[in-house]
Amino acid sequence: MKFSAVILAAGKGTRMYSNMPKVLHTLAGKPMVKHVIDTCTGLGAQNIHLVYGHGGDQMQAALAEEPVNWVLQAEQLGTGHAVDQASPQFEDDEKILVLYGDVPLISSETIESLLDAQPKGGIALLTVVLDNPTGYGRIVRKNGPVVAIVEQKDANEEQKLIKEINTGVMVATGGDLKRWLAGLNNDNAQGEYYLTDVIAAAHDEGNAVEAVHPVSPIEVEGVNDRAQLARLERAFQAAQAKKLLEQGVMLRDPARFDLRGELQCGLDVEIDVNVIIEGNVSLGDNVVIGAGCVLKDCEIDDNTIVRPYSVIEGATVGEQCTVGPFTRLRPGAEMRNDSHVGNFVEVKNARIGEGSKANHLTYLGDAEIGQRTNIGAGTITCNYDGANKFKTIIGNDVFVGSDSQLVAPLTIADGATIGAGTTLTKDVAEGELVITRAKERKVTGWQRPVKKK
């Protein structure tokens, strides 16, 4: 189905009390307007015309990679004026879909229904019935068909009783829409060029206006303040949690789970409370994620346990591993099968071999660790000299004692032992014991100093 979209995103968002354009405020980890753009691209829009105004530099920086045509609305003179700024780029025979950057939850299913419903030469309009329609434009019908939309400030008392309201989302053919936009005037209570006036223009020409309802009313809720944004965030998260539960994922409390990206899960996955998923995350069968964890762009294989309050980003974790609690796996971290990292361990750009362990208070950066190696508490790979990074290579079956500093670059061969408290600066051969601990000294009868009175 050939169509192009116009996304209106020029408003400042005064009630957000922010220096950032309203549509750049995030929902589920990405700007509201990007949700709308992604929906359009997913449906195969030929062109996406993004009408912007306030905070143009911020908008273009934040959305620099998006496939949009930038259309400036220098003065905000109404929705009709906004769409008209993009109209020179409309093809006469293409469907034009009008959407809003601050209405982020509009679904593909609803848009497809709207595109299908557009009558030849007429308009398909998305409407919804509200118990309290105050503030919205009212849908005026005459013996059934839609004949006009009247904004709240221009409505008479009878029209204010109408509960069917305009969402602003509509579809019309490019040539018709350009003609109707050219005929708009600003003779109304707000002195603006209303897009809604094209409904009456279409009716006056004898063209049909078809009203369509969204799959869910939440889809057409807009955001004008942070309370409304928070409401949509919770609605979105509830929907994501419901889908995961239906797919067999055990969410211990669906109300305390946030998905800000894409999550793929195997069978019998358990996720405890206050877990945040960002980017693309993959969890294998029987994976258990403890409370308060943050997972971003990572892969965790079967039968692995991630204990509470661990942060995993850009890392891969093998099968039968244990992570945490309070572990940080940074980009480039790789845990092979049956490896363990424990509390207050940080791993960056390092591989931990099969069966190896670093259970306490350790930093492993720019390192390769072989199989069945034990890293004692307080071990640090000293990988940075203030200008360059250097690598530490540790072989199989190595024992590194507690409170050791491994000053890279260096290699520790298979089976070596590093005594506790060692500062290591040179390579260690296979099977060697290295210890640099200072000689122990005992002072008999030592008396601690006392405070002066």
UniProtKB/Swiss-Prot annotation:
PANTHER family: BIFUNCTIONAL PROTEIN GLMU (PTHR43584:SF3), NUCLEOTIDYL TRANSFERASE (PTHR43584). Its main location: cytoplasm. Acetyl-CoA binds at residues 377, 383-384, 402, 420, 437. It is an enzyme of class 2 (transferase). UDP-N-acetyl-alpha-D-glucosamine binds at residues 8-11, 22, 73, 78-79, 100-102, 137, 151, 166, 224, 330, 348, 363, 374. The keyword Iron does not apply. Residues 1-226 are annotated as: Pyrophosphorylase. Homotrimer. Catalyzes the last two sequential reactions in the de novo biosynthetic pathway for UDP-N-acetylglucosamine (UDP-GlcNAc). The C-terminal domain catalyzes the transfer of acetyl group from acetyl coenzyme A to glucosamine-1-phosphate (GlcN-1-P) to produce N-acetylglucosamine-1-phosphate (GlcNAc-1-P), which is converted into UDP-GlcNAc by the transfer of uridine 5-monophosphate (from uridine 5-triphosphate), a reaction catalyzed by the N-terminal domain. Keywords: Acyltransferase, Cell shape, Cell wall biogenesis/degradation, Cytoplasm, Magnesium, Metal-binding, Multifunctional enzyme, Nucleotidyltransferase, Peptidoglycan synthesis, Repeat, Transferase. GO terms for cellular component: cytoplasm; membrane. GO terms for molecular function: glucosamine-1-phosphate N-acetyltransferase activity; magnesium ion binding; UDP-N-acetylglucosamine diphosphorylase activity. It catalyses: alpha-D-glucosamine 1-phosphate + acetyl-CoA = N-acetyl-alpha-D-glucosamine 1-phosphate + CoA + H(+); N-acetyl-alpha-D-glucosamine 1-phosphate + UTP + H(+) = UDP-N-acetyl-alpha-D-glucosamine + diphosphate. GO terms for biological process: cell morphogenesis; cell wall organization; lipid A biosynthetic process; peptidoglycan biosynthetic process; regulation of cell shape; UDP-N-acetylglucosamine biosynthetic process. Its cofactor is Mg(2+). Residues 227-247 are annotated as: Linker. The active site is at 360 (proton acceptor). InterPro entries: Bifunctional_GlmU, GlmU-like, GlmU_C_LbH, Hexapep, Hexapep_transf_CS, MobA-like_NTP_Trfase, Nucleotide-diphossugar_trans, Trimer_LpxA-like_sf. Residues 248-453 are annotated as: N-acetyltransferase. The lineage of its organism: Bacteria, Pseudomonadati, Pseudomonadota, Gammaproteobacteria, Vibrionales. Binds 1 Mg(2+) ion per subunit. It comes from Vibrio vulnificus (strain CMCP6). It is found in: Cytoplasm. This is Bifunctional protein GlmU. Its EC number is 2.7.7.23, 2.3.1.157. Pathway: Nucleotide-sugar biosynthesis; UDP-N-acetyl-alpha-D-glucosamine biosynthesis; N-acetyl-alpha-D-glucosamine 1-phosphate from alpha-D-glucosamine 6-phosphate (route II): step 2/2; Nucleotide-sugar biosynthesis; UDP-N-acetyl-alpha-D-glucosamine biosynthesis; UDP-N-acetyl-alpha-D-glucosamine from N-acetyl-alpha-D-glucosamine 1-phosphate: step 1/1; Bacterial outer membrane biogenesis; LPS lipid A biosynthesis. In the N-terminal section; belongs to the N-acetylglucosamine-1-phosphate uridyltransferase family. Mg(2+) binds at residues 102, 224.
